[in-house]
């Protein structure tokens, strides 16, 4: 156990908190753009086997970084003690790729897999994009956590765009709307977590997806709405709001795809 504690102390390195649009933030944004362009140019028309491999590799990377985060946030290097903080349990909106990407990688071709693909290019992409553009309080003094959060959210953006480009021929109203089904199912699971957490560990204020009926939402805009209306109404607005943004992303993606096809036809 002492060896494990020492090992964690070595990887739990602290330094200055990165600034919003400081050198570290800008570097991460630049790498995100560069890698997105590279993947689109190199693999936009790759076969399904290669596509699945890339999804799987991405999932493994973010899973390893998430495991690191869970260990570091649970260990107190000063006292050498362990305590799991359920606040860090990976079932938030931006954690969804941890659970969605395996379905994209392993499910057989069909409508169910398409729903997870659609979710990845819309809901998951949106979650990553928001944090990449405005990290807010995700930056902290722990160097490893800062790397983890940028790798994770950048992966959401990169995979969101890459998946959209690679799966562009599937674009349709039904394909896009299927993402809402996945989102609603995940939110339902999150609510279940929140209810159980309120019963078993009320002192930790568990609030997965910031949508629970017991703890006020901490999300921008939603934090203002939450205390003003009954929770069921808040939940409906929450699902509708996120779905509206996701469908807007799908609409923009489809516009780009249609324009690209027209340009190709003119060139031909």
Regions found by a protein language model. Give the residues of each.
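Non-cytosolic membrane-interface motifs at loop->transmembrane helix junctions
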Residues: 78-91, 141-151
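Membrane-embedded alpha-helical segments of multi-pass membrane proteins
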Residues: 26-32, 90-100, 120, 150-158
């Amino acid at each position: 156990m002492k060896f494990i504690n020492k090992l964690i102390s070595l990887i739990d390195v602290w330094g200055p908190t990165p600034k919003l649009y400081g050198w570290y933030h800008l570097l991460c944004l630049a790498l995100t753009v560069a890698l997105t362009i590279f993947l689109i140019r190199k693999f936009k028309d790759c076969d399904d086997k290669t596509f699945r491999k890339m999804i799987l590799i991405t999932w493994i990377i973010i899973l390893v970084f998430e495991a690191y985060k869970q260990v570091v946030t649970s260990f107190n290097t000063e006292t050498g003690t362990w305590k799991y903080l359920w606040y860090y349990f990976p079932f938030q909106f931006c954690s969804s790729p941890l659970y969605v990407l395996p379905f994209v990688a392993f499910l057989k071709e069909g409508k169910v897999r398409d729903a997870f693909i659609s979710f990845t290019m819309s809901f998951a992409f949106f979650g990553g994009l928001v944090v990449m553009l405005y990290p807010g309080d995700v930056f902290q003094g722990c160097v490893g956590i800062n790397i983890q959060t940028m790798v994770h959210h950048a992966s959401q953006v990169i995979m969101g765009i890459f998946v959209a480009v690679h799966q562009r021929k599937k674009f349709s109203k039904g394909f896009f709307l299927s993402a809402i089904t996945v989102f609603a199912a995940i939110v339902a699971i999150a609510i279940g977590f929140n209810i159980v957490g309120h019963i078993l560990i009320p002192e930790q204020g568990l609030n997965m997806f910031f949508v629970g009926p017991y703890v006020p939402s901490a999300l921008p805009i939603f934090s203002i709405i939450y205390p003003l209306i009954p929770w069921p109404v808040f939940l409906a607005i929450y699902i509708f709001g996120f779905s509206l943004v996701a469908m807007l992303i799908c609409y923009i993606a489809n516009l780009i795809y249609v324009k690209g096809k027209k340009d190709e036809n003119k060139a031909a």
